[in-house]
């Protein structure tokens, strides 16, 4: 049962997230030979100010 977690900065529309989840599901199903019903995609909208690579705050854009 594949679980796919995607962290993105906030700002994508619901339609974009739906398309992303569908396309990720297609690829995982094809490559991992897993039934689509067994694939779970989690999309986490990260507010600005919550990501600090190398100790520095990453801003959108």
UniProtKB/Swiss-Prot annotation:
InterPro entries in UniProt: 4-OT-like_dom (IPR004370), Tautomerase/MIF_sf (IPR014347)
Organism superkingdom: Bacteria
EC number: 5.3.2.-
An example Gene Ontology molecular-function term: isomerase activity
SUPFAM superfamilies: Tautomerase/MIF (SSF55331)
Catalytic residue positions: 2
A Pfam family of this chain: Tautomerase
The entry's keywords: Isomerase
Family the entry assigns: Belongs to the 4-oxalocrotonate tautomerase family.
UniProt name for this protein: Probable tautomerase SMU_1087
């Amino acid at each position: 049962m594949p679980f796919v977690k995607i962290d993105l900065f906030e700002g994508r529309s619901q339609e974009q997230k739906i398309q992303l989840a569908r396309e990720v599901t297609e690829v995982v199903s094809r490559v991992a030979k897993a039934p689509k019903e067994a694939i779970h995609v989690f999309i986490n909208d990260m507010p600005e100010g919550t990501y600090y690579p190398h100790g520095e705050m990453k801003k959108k854009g």
